[in-house]
């Protein structure tokens, strides 16, 4: 999933003036069919066991720099892990930092040669999370992450994980998006979550989760309230899978936690 910022005015290198996030990609066409088939192969007890016991994910953080541009100190990397652990505690997920790497490569730090970068840096298995912090993702993107797939090839495993704009870590320079919640949002896709809003402006169950009301549009900024589909409940403006400012985001629902557990068991656990 691609997560981007529409720019207002000129942005200095390493500093972004932001208006709103926009998304430039959708889940794989066959994803929901794969998800349903994988779930049907599980016993209900298998997924519920993950909810009860919790999920711990081995996590590798990769910092890409061009000279000093994009460097993230260890303290901010730990702050990012701490933030994700806090955000996902309500969903029964925790992240264990196994290793952090730093690579000075101007090409990779500009978001180019994704395949070459991941082939060189990817660590762990399909159940491991790799996050690549990149200072200059193309077209103002804040993040890109891949949904889990059934029977992943070796190429799919290597290309897995998330690319996140460096300035979105806690204390970063990306205005309105510097509390570490871009990584939280992107990791939601890694764990099988869709956006809470419809991608085509309709009032449908866009995210396949019963306790997130239908929402026909993404949230911009941090409104006091928003109800784009009257009658079904107000929009999930505080949900990590919307597009609100970081300060507005503070919630996963029980239904999302259940989908994460199901997705984990179906696609990633033991792989």
From Swiss-Prot:
Q: What is its EC number?
A: 3.4.24.-
Q: Superkingdom, according to UniProt?
A: Eukaryota
Query: What does this gene product do?
Result: Secreted metalloproteinase that allows assimilation of proteinaceous substrates. Plays a pivotal role as a pathogenicity determinant during infections and contributes to the ability of the pathogen to persist within the mammalian host.
| GO terms under cellular component | extracellular region
What PROSITE patterns does this protein's entry cite? ZINC_PROTEASE
Q: Which UniProt keywords apply?
A: Disulfide bond, Glycoprotein, Hydrolase, Metal-binding, Metalloprotease, Protease, Secreted, Signal, Virulence, Zinc
Q: What is its main location?
A: secreted
Single annotated GO MF: metal ion binding
Q: Which family does it belong to?
A: Belongs to the peptidase M43B family.
Disulfide bonds, paired cysteine numbers: 222-248
Which positions are glycosylated? 136, 200
**Localization of this protein:** Secreted
Q: Which Pfam families match?
A: Peptidase_M43
Q: Where is the active site?
A: 186
Query: Which residues belong to the signal peptide in this entry?
Result: 1-19
* InterPro entries reported in the protein's UniProt record: MetalloPept_cat_dom_sf, Peptidase_M43
Question: What positions does the entry give for Zn(2+) binding?
Answer: 185, 189
Name of the protein: Extracellular metalloprotease ARB_05317
A biological process (GO) annotation for this entry?
proteolysis
SUPFAM superfamilies recorded for this chain? Metalloproteases ('zincins'), catalytic domain
